[in-house]
Design a protein with these regions (language model features):
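Short, surface-exposed beta-edge/turn micro-motifs
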Residues: 1, 32-36, 48-50
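Extended, low-complexity, turn-rich repeat/linker tracts enriched in Gly/Pro/Ser/Thr and Asp/Glu
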Residues: 44-46
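Short coil-to-beta transition motif at edge beta-strands of beta-rich domains
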Residues: 27-41
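Contiguous surface segments at macromolecular interaction interfaces
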Residues: 1-3, 10-25, 62-135
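Residues that form ligand- and interface-recognition hot spots within folded domains
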Residues: 40, 59, 82
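Short beta-strand-centered aromatic/proline hotspots
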Residues: 48-60
Length: 135
């Protein structure tokens, strides 16, 4: 399973296209048929978790030549399968900062908010189950 933190143009849309997204923590392995949880980036005025979806297209993008350190970018298209029923964003996850406690909230805080950049990340099954509780 995967999660993405990104600026979402229309949070109510039935489908989303995210071009050239940074990947970390196994995010580059995303592929068609994967479940993804969409967080509308608070850095751009979003509200955190807004949707769960199914990846309908995924394409690895060639890295830019001449850059020594870069994560492999990916473009994806996602069909919304559910709308979040409760708020889950930076303020709800911030208290979970004991990085080795194994909690799903801590995994999300670490992967999304320790570095504020938008990105696609791989998540554990436990974190996926936790996120499903928001729908």
């Amino acid at each position: 399973m995967f999660a993405i933190k990104v600026e979402v143009g229309d949070p109510k849309a039935g489908a989303f296209a995210f071009a050239r997204q940074k990947t970390m923590y196994g995010g580059r392995r995303i592929s068609v048929g994967d479940t993804i949880f969409i967080f509308d980036s608070e850095n751009e005025g979003g509200s955190g978790l807004i949707a769960m979806g199914l990846v309908t297209a995924a394409e690895a993008i060639t890295k830019k030549p001449g850059l020594a350190r870069q994560t492999p970018p990916v473009s994806i298209t996602v069909k919304r399968t559910a709308q979040a029923k409760r708020r889950l964003g930076r303020s709800e996850l911030k208290p979970f900062s004991h990085w080795n406690d194994g909690r799903p909230e801590t995994e999300l805080n670490f992967k999304f908010y320790r570095q504020a950049t938008n990105k696609i990340v791989g998540i554990s099954d436990e974190t996926g189950a936790f996120l499903r509780g928001s729908f």
